[in-house]
Regions:
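A short, acidic loop/turn at secondary-structure junctions
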Residues: 1-13
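N-terminal low-complexity or simple alpha-helical regulatory segments
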Residues: 33-37
Length: 333
């Protein structure tokens, strides 16, 4: 069964496709398995060379989406709010455009007194783009931080990540680019990849788009990834799994999109929580059999994506302040 619904007149050719299959009850079984497929097609928002300008939200009033927000911590401990201080503070060799959420380091400058390492911190409901001194481009997702040298050393380029980032590494065969996150280390020469390793979550995930990377983790020999491969390391049981994926699905967040492909709520909720800065409440057991396909813009109010979940006729919700509660349809609130 397929339905087409005009969910927002402000966007032309906006299509919602709803498919579901109800599995028949079988003798001695107590549950019903369901697969829900929701697709949404809307305008794409692409990064310009210098960054992206976040559009006005066109969603219903409610909890607003995130946007360009970051704090730059200098080597001497000084903190620069890139939203408030960007028009008044000047630093040698560093420029930024907060409207486009971009900070750029000029690697040609090396002045005495420069801090050795900086940290770019992106809070909940934030995102930012960084161009390092070697020209490497980094997109930082919400609730993430990157520690890096103002100028890289002669033998290697090493950064430390907490959270999620997409890297487009400038090739330099003489200086491998190394990303460290906890016990996991990724070494590249020049490539594009996504690295997700949030503190408090057991899994670290590296997804390769182009080039080649070598990943090392405790208890495992170095593993080499090829384009279209994803490595997931479970820190709790120290297991590593490599599988083939559509790598583009894992980096569309940098282009202003949410894409959940055959995902359960346990995968969807953390991303929504970080981006909208809200707390979700739901009974995992009641939603364990549901999988979703959702594609929509990140810059809509939270009600837009919650209403997409509601279209499945399996999910309802309530919002109170910054807390969202999800219910299985028919469940008493």
């Amino acid at each position: 069964m397929e339905k087409q619904i005009d969910t927002d007149r402000s966007f032309k050719k906006l299509t919602v496709r709803l498919k579901w299959r109800c599995w028949k009850r079988r003798i001695l079984t107590a549950g019903v398995a369901a697969m829900v497929m929701i697709g949404i097609m809307s305008a794409f928002w692409w990064w310009e060379q210098e960054g992206i300008t976040v559009p006005e939200s066109a969603g219903q009033p409610g909890i607003k989406p995130g946007g360009n927000c970051a704090v730059l911590v200098l080597g001497n401990g000084c903190r620069v709010d890139l939203q408030k201080d960007c028009d008044t503070l000047q630093l040698p060799g560093i420029s930024w455009d907060h409207r486009k959420g971009t900070i750029v380091y000029d690697g040609r400058e090396n002045k005495t007194g420069w801090p050795e390492r900086n940290t770019l911190m992106v809070p909940l409901r934030g995102e930012y783009r960084l161009v390092l001194g070697d020209g490497t481009k980094v997109w930082l997702n919400s609730a993430s931080s990157l520690n890096y040298p103002v100028q890289f050393a002669e033998k290697e380029r090493c950064v430390e990540l907490d959270g999620e980032a997409y890297f487009e590494v400038t090739p330099d065969p003489e200086r491998p680019f190394i990303v460290k996150s906890g016990d996991v280390q990724t070494r590249v020469l020049g490539t594009a990849f996504n690295f997700s390793a949030y503190r408090g979550e057991n899994a670290s995930t590296i997804t390769l788009l182009t080039g080649k990377v070598a990943v090392s983790a405790p208890g495992h020999a170095e593993r080499v990834l090829l384009p279209g491969q994803q490595l997931k390391y479970d820190a709790e049981n120290r297991k590593t799994v490599i599988k083939e994926v559509d790598a583009e699905d894992f980096v569309v967040w940098k282009d202003g999109l949410f894409l959940f492909n055959d995902c359960g709520l346990e995968e969807i909720i953390p991303r929504l929580s970080r981006w909208y800065g809200v707390t979700f409440h739901y009974d995992r057991e009641k939603f364990g059999d549901l999988k979703f396909y959702i594609k929509t813009r990140r810059y809509e109010d939270i009600g837009t994506i919650l209403n997409l979940l509601k279209l499945t006729e399996n999910v309802t919700y309530s919002i109170e302040g910054n807390e969202v509660t999800l219910y299985r349809t028919g469940e008493n609130k």
